[in-house]
């Protein structure tokens, strides 16, 4: 009896060390790695030019994406058009402080990070230090970005 009780206690204590698993069978770590792989793919596309970024954008964003940035709320179609026409350019200098939070039993992931660089649309160029929030949803087994929001880093937090 004591041996059985000890075995149960030991087994249950080790369960706390296992990675949390979502209802879809994936761990938070696996989901984080999937989201970061998409982000790394975007970074690689940025190094190849705006046409490559537009291709990435088309693959990884929902058709009804809500994209909020310097020029305001824009659609996926508007952003892709501006990228392909040469009207929009993004040049990150430093991107860091990545964090992924998993929600909805593994069906939603929120990616936050900071970025410094320049963004231009039309004849307007913005130097920026931004907080970025991207919300991804798992649709038909694939992660798609459904919300992108960029907010300026307050002056007293810049350079940190």
Where do the PLM segments sit?
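Bacterial N-terminal signal peptides that target proteins for export
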Residues: 1-7
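Short beta-strand segments enriched in hydrophobic/aromatic residues
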Residues: 61, 115-117, 149-152
């Amino acid at each position: 009896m004591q041996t059985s009780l000890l075995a149960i206690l030991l087994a249950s204590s080790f369960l706390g060390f296992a990675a949390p698993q979502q209802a879809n069978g994936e761990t938070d770590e696996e989901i984080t790695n999937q989201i970061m792989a998409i982000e790394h793919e975007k970074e690689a596309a940025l190094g190849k030019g705006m046409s490559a970024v537009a291709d990435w954008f088309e693959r990884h964003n929902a058709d009804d994406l809500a994209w909020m940035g310097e020029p305001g709320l824009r659609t996926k179609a508007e952003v892709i058009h501006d990228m392909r026409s040469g009207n929009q350019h993004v040049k990150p200098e430093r991107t860091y402080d990545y964090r992924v939070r998993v929600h909805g039993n593994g069906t939603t992931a929120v990616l936050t990070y900071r970025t410094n660089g320049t963004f231009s649309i039309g004849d307007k160029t913005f130097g920026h230090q931004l907080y970025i929030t991207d919300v991804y949803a798992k649709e038909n087994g694939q992660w798609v970005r459904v919300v992108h929001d960029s907010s300026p880093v307050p002056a007293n937090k810049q350079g940190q």
